[in-house]
């Protein structure tokens, strides 16, 4: 069956489609049906089933005789460490950790915050929570104390599992003082903290509250898997809301496993035992879904990489990883490839490695500009697949389903909506628009299994954020269009569609033009306030390493390119060359913050920012164009 047939089968009978997919999961009690719609528009899936995520991700592979298969490859260029963990070893380690947590009083429904770097123990902590039916909330290691405190107060965890430190290129990030500061600030106090001591820094433990990761496991009975209901929250993952309180996305246990398991073969086209590498972080949704859960649910080998695409030690790190670990599928953010391309524009380092194991490259997290996709296609000679999803959804809304059928790639499009997703482009009034017309991207309810059923302790906010604007739909917050072949194009966040003298224009389309310039490594376009036209586009350009060009000349060339390719209507005349762009740690460019700086508006320092100093550089650059007036 090709894509059209599979999609049609889902449309004809979604209930049968998802019940069939649910057969791939071990259930203690099979669900009586897939969709539970008695509380619409709040839908739930597999509610009356009973199952356990850790059993499905670890124990069942051991039971099936695959205990010797590698579950986790740990490769840490920042600490010069490598080791592997088999499924059998993982089962022993997770059961022991879960037993120790249980002895300290952790049980089904309790929340546990995990504050860890990219080490296998982070996955073990997640799985140990799942084993007990506890609800984990992973917070990106090294996150500021205030932000951690806000999450402690929202999730009210009984315990926090943390590492003593994280390692960034050239520096040690001290986690324990951040954790202590967060607990001091938080109104809610955890009963205890488990500290994984790394040899790079041994943290001081607070007597009575903190226990050592290894010591508290001594002599403890290992824990068995606790069955939970299909709609039991597997985890809470906070996505930084643009204002105020972070939003706690809830992930339901049953649908999460069914959907992720389905994607491994159908989208990524892997088999059990294949090596799958999502080069992300466990603190983000990609790390939850595709470092921890999906590869292990499917019986693959997952990769925990503690390093960066460049600088650990060079722009060849990804290629070394692929050769050394025989990686079949690589999934990363376009930002990572832009960083590699900036350091090694001609891709000369690729030739030093044997990449024959690589079957495909998947990109998500930021719009993948055509220039980056073409560069990767040319060098890697494998399908380069952009796909689109959100923290809220947990897996792809639109993709090229390589395991069903490799569809023609249209550069600039994450291809087509996956079974389960009825994607519609709507105008302001909520009416579907014809192909080729820019509008708000929405998904007709119900959303498929594994997506967020609500926000943690914030149902009213869930409805307001996602359901109220377009009744009967989930509002994605992205803007784009669908072409006549059904391919989706994501042009910008709805906030990044700018209005220039009454014309609605996508900043993403302008970024594509800028990125295509041979000397430009990376770029961003924002809309700044203009008395005459309402808004004007303004571009930021980062140059390739070794590009010895006059900045003003390059600015002149990109201004001309936008005029030629989008037209004078874009009114694109403002651009400035900068050393780097402000980003979140997951690689998303902070366009909204740059807009506020340009307009001289008040802004809150984004919690997820990688390096706050960059905002000062952006302000200085904007002042040369007469913006960011204070």
Predicted feature residues:
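AMP-binding/adenylate-forming catalytic core of the ANL superfamily
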Residues: 139-165, 179, 323, 330, ...
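Conserved AMP-binding/adenylate-forming core of the ANL superfamily
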Residues: 54, 72-127, 144, 148-149, ...
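AMP-binding/adenylate-forming catalytic domain of the ANL superfamily
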Residues: 191, 195-197, 532-535, 564-589, ...
């Amino acid at each position: 069956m090709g894509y059209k047939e599979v999609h049609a089968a889902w449309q004809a009978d979604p209930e049968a489609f998802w019940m069939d997919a649910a057969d791939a999961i071990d259930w203690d009690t099979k669900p009586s049906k897939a969709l539970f719609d008695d509380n619409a528009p709040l839908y739930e899936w597999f509610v009356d089933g009973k199952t356990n995520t850790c059993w499905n991700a670890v124990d069942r592979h051991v039971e099936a005789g695959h205990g010797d298969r590698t579950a986790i490859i740990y490769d840490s260029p920042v600490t010069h460490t490598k080791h592997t963990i088999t499924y059998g070893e993982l089962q022993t380690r997770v059961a022991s950790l879960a037993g120790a947590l249980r002895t300290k009083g952790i049980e089904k429904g309790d929340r546990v915050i995990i504050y860890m770097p990219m080490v296998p123990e982070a996955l073990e902590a997640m799985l140990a929570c799942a084993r007990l039916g506890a609800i984990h909330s992973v917070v990106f290691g090294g996150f500021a104390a205030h932000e951690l405190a806000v999450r402690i107060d929202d999730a009210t965890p009984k315990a926090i599992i943390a590492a003593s430190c994280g390692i960034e290129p050239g520096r040690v990030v001290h986690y324990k003082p951040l954790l202590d500061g967060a607990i001091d600030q938080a109104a809610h106090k955890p009963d205890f903290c488990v500290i994984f001591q790394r040899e790079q820094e041994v943290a001081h433990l607070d007597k009575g509250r903190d226990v050592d990761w290894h010591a508290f496991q001594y002599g403890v009975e290992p824990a068995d898997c606790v069955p939970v209901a299909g709609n039991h929250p597997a985890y809470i993952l906070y996505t930084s809301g643009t204002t105020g309180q972070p939003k706690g996305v809830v992930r339901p246990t049953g649908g999460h496993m069914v959907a992720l398991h389905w994607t491994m073969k159908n989208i990524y086209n892997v088999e059990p035992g294949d090596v799958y590498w999502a080069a992300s972080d466990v603190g983000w949704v990609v790390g939850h879904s595709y470092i921890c859960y999906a590869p292990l649910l499917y019986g693959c080998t997952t990769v925990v990489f503690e390093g960066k695409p460049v600088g650990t030690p060079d722009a060849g790190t990804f290629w070394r990883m692929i050769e050394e670990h025989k990686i079949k599928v690589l999934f990363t953010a376009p930002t990572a490839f832009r960083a590699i391309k900036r350091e090694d524009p001609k891709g000369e380092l690729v030739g030093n490695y044997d990449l024959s194991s690589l079957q495909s490259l998947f990109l998500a997290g930021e719009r993948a500009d055509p220039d980056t996709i073409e560069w990767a296609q040319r060098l890697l000679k494998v399908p380069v697949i952009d796909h689109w999803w959100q923290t809220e959804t947990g897996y792809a809304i639109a993709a090229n389903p390589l395991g069903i059928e490799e569809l023609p790639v249209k550069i600039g499009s994450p291809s087509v909506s996956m079974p389960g997703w009825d994607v519609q482009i709507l105008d302001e009034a909520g009416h579907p628009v014809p192909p080729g017309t820019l509008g708000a991207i929405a998904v007709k309810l119900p959303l498929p299994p594994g997506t967020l059923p609500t926000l943690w302790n914030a149902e009213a906010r869930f409805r307001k954020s996602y359901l109220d604007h377009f009744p009967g739909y989930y509002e994605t917050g992205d803007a784009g269009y669908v072409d006549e072949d059904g391919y989706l194009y994501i042009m910008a966040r709805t906030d990044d569609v700018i209005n220039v003298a009454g014309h609605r224009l996508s900043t993403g389309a302008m970024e594509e033009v800028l990125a295509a310039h041979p000397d430009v490594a990376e770029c961003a376009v924002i809309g700044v306030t203009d008395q005459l036209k309402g808004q004007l586009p303004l571009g930021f350009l980062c140059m390739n390493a070794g590009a010895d060009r006059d900045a003003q000349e390059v600015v002149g060339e990109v201004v001309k390119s936008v005029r030629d390719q989008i037209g004078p209507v874009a009114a694109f005349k403002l651009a400035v060359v900068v050393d780097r762009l402000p980003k979140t740690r997951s690689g998303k460019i902070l366009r909204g913050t740059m807009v506020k700086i340009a307009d001289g508006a008040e802004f809150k320092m984004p919690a997820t920012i990688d390096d706050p100093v960059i905002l000062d550089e952006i302000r200085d650059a904007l002042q040369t164009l007469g913006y960011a007036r204070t």
